[in-house]
Amino acid sequence: MEERYPLTIPDSLLEKMNAQMLLRSQVETVVRTAEETGTMVLDEAQGIYYGHGRFGSVTIWAAWRRTDAGPELCNVYSHRVVVKEVL
């Protein structure tokens, strides 16, 4: 069994994830991958990092803060839009 990534998720966001049918493991993967690869954006004024990942037809965006205890989720959202280049 894979060890859970130490991402703190407030109950309100767990409820939001459940309503949007987003898996905790997918959100953890977004944050872990962004942290490991550096593919994230930092809002310096707020101290919030943003990263995203694609899971099938769904793109999940996560916003988190770094804390002494590890990352803490601030927001999460998703979309099912695919942008294709038209020539």
Residue map of PLM features:
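Ribonuclease/tRNase effector modules and their secretory precursors
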Residues: 1-87
